[in-house]
Amino acid sequence: MPTAPAGFVVSSYAELPSPRMMVYAPNGDLFVSSPASSTITVLRDANSDGVFEARGVYAQAPPRGAAPPPVAARTGGPGAGAPPPPGRGAGPSILGAAAPACAPPPAFAERGPGTLGAPFGMAFHDGYLYVGNTGSIVRYKYATGDMQAQGEPEKLLDLPTGGHSTRNILFNRAGTKMYVSVGSQSNNDAGEDCRRAAILEFNPDGTGYRIYASGIRNPVGLALQPGTDTIWTAMNERDNYGDDLVPDYATSVKDGQFYGWPYSYIGKNYDPRYVGAFPELVNRAIVPDVLIPAHSAALGITFYTGTRFAQRYRNGAFVALHGSWNRSVAAGYKVVFFPMNNGRPGPIEDFLTGFLSSDGANETPIQQWGRPVGVTVSRDGALLVSDDSGNRIWKVATAR
């Protein structure tokens, strides 16, 4: 059983295969994505007592035709599907004085029939459930109380595939803009599709494409800071530079800004492969708000908007750290918290630990029995944590 600070109680909320992201429907049903089986499950707590009474499969891809299971950031070691190591791709010798411009394929936002393929992020908006597949954004017509999809989804746009596979979705408070996170194809190669290593902005119907922010290697979690339209992301940085480089991070995301990848990290610190490249671009690289130990694999992020936790947790953020595969001593495998004071983040602290079954030193693979992925605040003010290795959702509530 994972361990939370004194005053909290941890329990198993649900058991289901490889749960990843979670989102609440307008009526309080909890929707859970499982990319490995291309399934979306719905859990219903009709009497709001914090225990679900009904469970159903909202949507599932056919056995044949579903997208292959995604390779999540750092989930099993540097095998098939892992980001390539340094030494491949464009190097500084071919880089010019200005960052290259690019345009996505002209028909990438062409609407049409859709399907489910390794779904990850989800969002409810204006009578639809939006789903981030690895290779597309689709939406299902949704009526309050639906436990099963009303037919096949509509595809709004295509996304590049390969490499980092998670696609998350977030709407602004007015519901006028949709934001989609797309990770890089490689570890740190230049010259990728400009829709990658970025947060993209669209209208709710998939039109109006633009790059909202770039240079973010693998932005996985997305959340709005309470009371604002400020986007925050939890992000996986690059590998193969030793145990302590490069730190992962959680950060607010500023419109039109560049966050360094692949040319630099933590602002203007050059990646060894690109020293001297694109100085004007690197000079304006943003320093992230909250640094997280390297290779922790920061995935889900949510702000605490409930009222059951102590005041110090209000409007602070929880981040799920999925855990490392390439450190001499394991990092991550826990949920961390950082408070917000006058809109600024404080230092991170452990919140939910105990997912490692050893000290995590010099092990391949790491001996663990759980890996946190998604975090969300339940309707009764608890924190839910999905665990795709332990195949369950954990609930952290205040002790009564």
Kindly label every feature range from the protein language model:
Residues 373-400:
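Blade-level signature of beta-propeller repeat domains, shared across WD40, Kelch, NHL, RCC1
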Residues 27-28, 126-127, 174-176, 228-229, ...:
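Short coil/turn segments that connect the beta-strands within blades of beta-propeller domains
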Residues 1-4, 64-74, 111, 166, ...:
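Beta-propeller domain segments
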Residues 54-73, 96-125, 134-174, 181-184, ...:
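Asp-box/WD-like beta-propeller blade repeats and closely related beta-sheet repeat scaffolds
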